[in-house]
Amino acid sequence: MAVGKNKGLSKGGKKGGKKKVIDPFSRKDWYDVKAPNMFQTRQIGKTLVNRTQGQRIASDYLKGRVFEVSLADLQKDIDPERSFRKFRLIAEDVQDRNVLCNFHGMDLTTDKYRSMVKKWQTLIEAIVEAKTSDGYLLRIFCIGFTSKDQQSQRKTCYAQQSQVRKIRARMTDIITNEVSGVDLKQLVNKLALDSIAKDIEKSCQRIYPLHDVYIRKVKVLKKPRFDVSKLLELHNDGGGKTTEAVVSAEGAVIDRPEGYEPPVQEAV
C-alpha cells in the first residue's frame, strides 16, 4: 500500500464538487389575472410564467390557462346561493403584465350537487346544446327534483314518466330560447343571477312541483374566431394608436404611453 496524499480527495474530485444552486423563481415573472367587466372583482389573482427567452415567449405559455373562481369571490358577495357556483375563465390575450380572460364554463361544487340527491323524489335532468347570438356553442346541463305537495300525506313524490318527459321538454325549450337570443356577456349575467333556473321552476309547476332547479354545468364546445377588439371591450379597453389602456384591479382604465415597459424587479 502506497503511503502519501491522495490529490483527488484533497481537491474534492470532479464529482464531489459543489454545484451552484439557482433559484427557479428568479427566471419567472408574476402576471395579474383579469376577469371580464361583467364581474365586480376584476383582478382574481396572479399567475407565474417563465420569463421570455429567445423564441420562448411568455405570453404563449399564458394563453389557454384556465382559472376556476367562486361566484361569491367574483361578485364580492357572501350570499350562500353564490358560493357553490364555480366559473371557469380562460386566458385569451396578454397586455403588458395583465392576462385578459373570458368565460369558459360553469359548474356546481361537488358537495352541493351531492347534497341535493335524496330518496323519495324523482331526479330530472336535461342536456341542451344551444348557440348564442355571437357564435358560442354551449352544452348546458339542467337539473331539478320533484317536490312534495304540502297537502299530500304520501311519503314519496315520484313523477310519472310522461310528466318527466314533459318537464324535460319544457327545460329544453326554455334554455334554447334564453341562450339563442342573447350574446355571451348577457348569458353570463343570467347564469350569475340564476334567472333561467327560476323560469324553469315556475313554468313546470303546472306539470309537477319542482325544487332545487339549477343550471348544473355549462361547457363551451365551440368559439368564434378570436377577435382582440371584442375581448378588449369586455375589459373596458378600446385600444388607441397613441395610448394603451390597461385595466386596473378596480375596473378603471389607466392610460399609459405607447411603448411603456414596467420596471424590472430585482427580486421576486
Swiss-Prot record:
Q: Can you quote a single GO CC term?
A: cytosolic small ribosomal subunit
Question: Where do the segments described as Disordered lie?
Answer: 1-21
Q: What's the main place this protein lives?
A: cytoplasm
For this UniProt entry, the molecular function terms from Gene Ontology, in alphabetical order, are: structural constituent of ribosome
For this protein, the record's InterPro entries field holds: Ribosomal_eS1, Ribosomal_eS1_CS, Ribosomal_eS1_euk
Keyword annotations: Cytoplasm, Developmental protein, Differentiation, Oogenesis, Ribonucleoprotein, Ribosomal protein
Organism domain of life: Eukaryota
Q: Name one Pfam family in it.
A: Ribosomal_S3Ae
UniProt record, GO biological process: oogenesis; translation
Its biological function?
A: Essential for oogenesis; required for late follicle cell development.
The record's comment on protein family reads: Belongs to the eukaryotic ribosomal protein eS1 family.
The record's note on quaternary structure and interaction partners says:
Component of the small ribosomal subunit. Mature ribosomes consist of a small (40S) and a large (60S) subunit. The 40S subunit contains about 33 different proteins and 1 molecule of RNA (18S). The 60S subunit contains about 49 different proteins and 3 molecules of RNA (28S, 5.8S and 5S).
Which PANTHER family did the record assign?
40S RIBOSOMAL PROTEIN S3A
Q: What is this protein called?
A: Small ribosomal subunit protein eS1
Source organism of this protein record: Drosophila grimshawi (Hawaiian fruit fly)
Encoding gene, per UniProt annotation: RpS3A
